[in-house]
């Protein structure tokens, strides 16, 4: 079997199948042979496990997953890739390709049908432009997955893994921390890809929590995250100003809620923890 990280192999495959990499799909193939084994190992996949992959490309990471998991299901939106994958994955009978959009496919039904009671890990080299929507769909639907190990743009990785209440945290950091325990594993230089992106990448692992990190008031997650998004919508302002503007509330009401929750009225959005946003949401809705 040809080495899928070899540039000549990639060019030969692309030429024979008349395949041109698509900027629209954010396609950058991995040519560093050491990266994908590290991703697969970091996911903790082994005998008895299932692996769900998003965007297999020509199968570089897929191959490493197939060597470790009982079954690998890869979701691919690019209709041009199945013929290439049929060739590159021909030696693995535990591989299945699903031609669909990961943001539209019924993931709960897919996981139940393909993996049953197996522990499942998600692995992917995610397109930069759609990282957050994919990760949030995987987390928000409370799917039966153990962890998510993905390669993303390093700047996004740092934001995704930033602890709530710290300077680097953004609204997405709070959402990730609510559903999972994130860890930034290692960086990947741009020369590890073909074509080489202009930015550095990084691999992160999200260990999915069995229950969310905090219990939001009335279980209203939509209102809880609307509050956090409003707070971060005007990051340079105080949380009070941003929330009042973002949720169209009187500033006096927000200040009263902050005081009632025992929080600093001058706090910046990133200075509040998940627990403190819960307390604030509760105070805002307590009459």
Give the location of each predicted region:
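Catalytic cores of RNA-modifying enzymes
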Residues: 1-222, 226-230, 259, 270, ...
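C-terminal lobe and adjacent flexible extensions of AdoMet/dcAdoMet transferase-like proteins
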Residues: 208, 228-287
């Amino acid at each position: 079997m040809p080495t899928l990280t070899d540039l000549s192999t990639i060019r030969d495959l692309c030429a024979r199948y008349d395949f041109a990499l698509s900027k629209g799909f954010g396609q950058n193939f991995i040519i560093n042979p050491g990266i994908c084994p590290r991703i697969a190992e970091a996911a903790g996949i082994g005998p008895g496990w299932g692996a769900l992959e998003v965007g297999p490309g020509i199968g570089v990471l897929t191959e490493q997953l197939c060597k470790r998991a009982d079954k690998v299901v890869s979701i691919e939106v690019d209709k041009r890739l199945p013929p290439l994958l049929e060739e590159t994955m021909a030696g693995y009978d535990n591989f299945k390709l699903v031609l669909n959009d990961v943001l539209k496919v019924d993931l709960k039904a897919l996981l139940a049908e393909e993996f049953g009671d197996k522990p499942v890990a998600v692995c992917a080299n995610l397109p930069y432009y759609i990282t957050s929507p994919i990760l949030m769909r995987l987390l928000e639907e409370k799917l039966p997955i153990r962890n998510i190990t993905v390669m993303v743009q390093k700047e996004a990785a740092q934001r995704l893994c930033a602890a709530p209440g710290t300077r680097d945290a953004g609204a997405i950091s709070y959402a990730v921390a609510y559903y999972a325990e994130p860890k930034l594993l290692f960086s990947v230089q741009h020369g590890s890809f073909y074509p080489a992106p202009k930015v550095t990448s990084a691999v992160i692992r999200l260990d999915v929590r069995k229950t969310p990190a905090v219990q939001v008031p009335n279980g209203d997650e939509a209102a809880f995250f609307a509050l956090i998004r409003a707070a971060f919508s005007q990051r340079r302002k105080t949380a009070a100003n941003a929330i009042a503007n973002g949720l169209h509330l009187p500033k006096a009401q927000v200040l009263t809620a902050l005081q009632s929750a025992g929080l600093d009225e001058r706090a910046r959005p990133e200075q509040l923890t998940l627990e403190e946003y819960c307390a604030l949401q509760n105070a805002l809705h307590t009459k």
